[in-house]
Amino acid sequence: RLRYFVRVTVTRGYASSLIKEQEFIVQVAQPAPETNTPVKMEVGIEECLHIEFEYDKSKYHLADVVVGKVYFLLVRIKIKHMELAVIRREAAGAGPNQHNESETITKYEVMDGAPVRGECVPIRLFLRNFNLTSTYRGINNKFSVRYYLNLVLVDQEERRYFKQQEITLYRAA
């Protein structure tokens, strides 16, 4: 986890040193992206499950709303429910010293029960409610923060079928 802080050390000759740290927040404002294309993808398992999902855009403001839909083209397995999760992946360091951390920010159920062919499930996720930061890619080849939308289908035998889609988050100027 990346953090910014000021550390003050008072060295005393007659006793141990005093050390105090104070964290602070750095906000990097960015202009809104000029192009923001929708994300549309078809995924599936041959002859078992075939879905098409769509998100209205690929780049979101931190207070934006993710709007989308999942359309079931073929359903031959018994789906129990469908979840949508926001995942943050942080990477710090380089080469063999790189440390990766993944955190599920939120997960919620968008559908309960078995869908039928032709069913369309709407998605609406308000990002403002979560503690998110902007996306950072390869800062000095030492640090990155990336976000993913993870769509998960769970069947009756608790098998999980998922598709992750990277999204970009930004803080408006």
Language model features: what each stretch is:
Residues R1-A173:
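C-terminal beta-sandwich interaction modules and adjacent acidic
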